[in-house]
């Protein structure tokens, strides 16, 4: 045999037949497994060098060719495009949830003042009810949890959602309980947090809670019972990604509604202009207005931006350096948080321009944009303190508000007219 000759060994027929049979068996098993057979990936690629909030976004994987979702301001109806039957949209529903975490009953999706039967009155505005109105994302059984992958390559950022953990880059941080176990459902508040004298509530027809510091907000949220707390960065980031992928734009206000971003009055007797909760109980899963005087609603959640700032866990600025913790337990000092690789000097503010996508979500890393470019939202920071994240903006912030609107300039001890928090729930572990 000459040097350099290649030897190819061919298995005998019996071995080949066994391999063929085994392969067919594996493929058949995979075909019968809905969780594998029905794998979906909906991705968005964002060009950092394109300042246009719409053209900078390109669909990837199963999202390619889909019509984006957006509010139709001419008809006054939300247009789901091709997204109405996507798992994280169709498996989202409004429900009343007891303090112990038990789902009591579903609400009529188009009129939350009624139960799902469309006739029986609900407790959505009943302060005597022992629980809260929550937006539920059901990932149980074969429905599929919302797995998220975020990263960047060169001048492109990527956010991809799947109904399975497609590979190791996909996380379910928003589902992680304080004991480290993983839930199958997510519970977001349908309404901005109000206060009943004991606890933060998510109910319609209530005055928003404000002028509270972080410790008070957390204490009042936890007063609902085990598993209740204020919001977190991982939950905020996940839902923001869902909105961006659905709408194929970085301008959340154009796609979903401006939100109440005006109306401030310097009068405590008028609650400084904050709208009461429940303005959109008869407006379905998504709804918004082009003007600045009405609420916005996404995934049955009112006030995702505007009206009042919401303080959240899991994102801090300590000495100018942004730190994140994607799963509980949380604290207000930065202990056990991780560096996200973004640092700002001194203090300041500006329209967001650059953003960084990583395992820690998508976070602003430079300013210089405008209300109609890049993320179209504003950022405040203070490098001289330990700042706790505020998100969404208030009724005095105008175009600065939005899904990406972020404030890292105020300490945990700050209590002010435009700051409060809302109540979230981790799914209880089944008995």
Cite the ranges covered by each PLM segment.
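Short, low-complexity N-terminal tether/leader segments at secretion or assembly junctions of large
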Residues: 1-33
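GGW-centered surface loops in extracellular recognition modules
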Residues: 34-136, 142-144
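C-terminal, surface-exposed recognition/capping segments
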Residues: 40-50, 235-237, 261-273, 281, ...
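Short, polar loop/linker segments at the starts of domains and inter-domain junctions
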Residues: 53-67, 150-165, 197-212, 401-402, ...
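Carbohydrate-recognition beta-sandwich/jelly-roll modules
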Residues: 71, 133-180, 227, 347, ...
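Short aromatic-cysteine micro-motif
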Residues: 124-131, 163-304
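A short, polar/charged loop-to-alpha-helix boundary motif
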Residues: 318-329
């Amino acid at each position: 045999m000459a040097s350099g000759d290649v030897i190819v060994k061919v298995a005998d027929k019996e071995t080949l037949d066994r391999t063929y049979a085994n392969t067919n068996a594996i493929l058949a098993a995979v075909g019968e497994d809905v969780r594998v057979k029905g794998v979906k990936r909906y991705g968005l690629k964002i060009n950092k060098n394109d300042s246009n909030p719409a053209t900078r976004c390109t669909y990837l994987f199963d999202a390619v060719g889909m019509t984006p979702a957006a509010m139709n301001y001419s008809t006054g109806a939300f247009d789901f495009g091709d997204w109405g039957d996507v798992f994280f949209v169709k498996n989202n529903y409004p429900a009343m949830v007891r303090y112990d975490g038990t789902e009591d009953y579903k609400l009529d999706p188009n009129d939350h003042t009624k139960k799902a039967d469309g006739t029986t009155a609900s407790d959505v505005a009943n302060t005597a009810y022992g629980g809260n109105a929550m937006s539920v994302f059901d990932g149980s059984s074969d429905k599929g949890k919302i797995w998220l992958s975020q990263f960047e390559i060169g001048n492109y950022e990527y956010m991809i959602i799947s109904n399975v953990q497609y590979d190791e880059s996909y996380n379910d941080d928003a589902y992680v309980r304080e004991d480290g176990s993983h839930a199958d459902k997510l519970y977001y508040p349908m309404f901005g947090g109000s206060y009943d004298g004991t606890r933060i509530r998510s109910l319609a027809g209530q005055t928003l809670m404000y002028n509270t510091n972080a410790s008070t907000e957390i204490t009042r949220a936890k007063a609902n019972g085990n598993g209740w707390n204020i919001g977190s960065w991982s939950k905020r980031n996940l839902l923001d990604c869902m909105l961006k992928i659905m709408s194929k734009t970085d301008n959340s206000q154009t796609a979903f509604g401006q939100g109440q971003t005006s109306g401030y009055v310097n009068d405590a007797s008028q609650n400084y202009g904050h709208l009461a909760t429940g303005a959109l109980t008869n407006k379905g899963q998504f709804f918004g207005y082009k003007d600045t005087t009405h609420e916005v609603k996404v995934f049955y959640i009112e006030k995702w931006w505007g009206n009042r700032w919401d303080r959240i866990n899991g994102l801090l600025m300590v000495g100018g350096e942004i730190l994140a913790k994607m799963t509980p337990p949380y604290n207000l000092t930065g202990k056990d948080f991780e560096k996200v690789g973004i640092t700002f000097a001194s203090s300041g503010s500006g329209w967001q321009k650059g953003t960084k996508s990583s395992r820690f979500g998508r976070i602003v890393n430079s300013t210089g944009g405008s209300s109609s470019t890049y993320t179209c939202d504003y950022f405040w920071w203070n490098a001289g303190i330990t700042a706790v994240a505020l998100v969404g903006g208030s009724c005095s912030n105008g175009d600065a508000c939005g899904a990406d609107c972020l404030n890292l300039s105020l300490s945990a001890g700050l209590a002010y007219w435009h700051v409060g928090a809302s109540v979230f729930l981790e799914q209880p572990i089944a008995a």
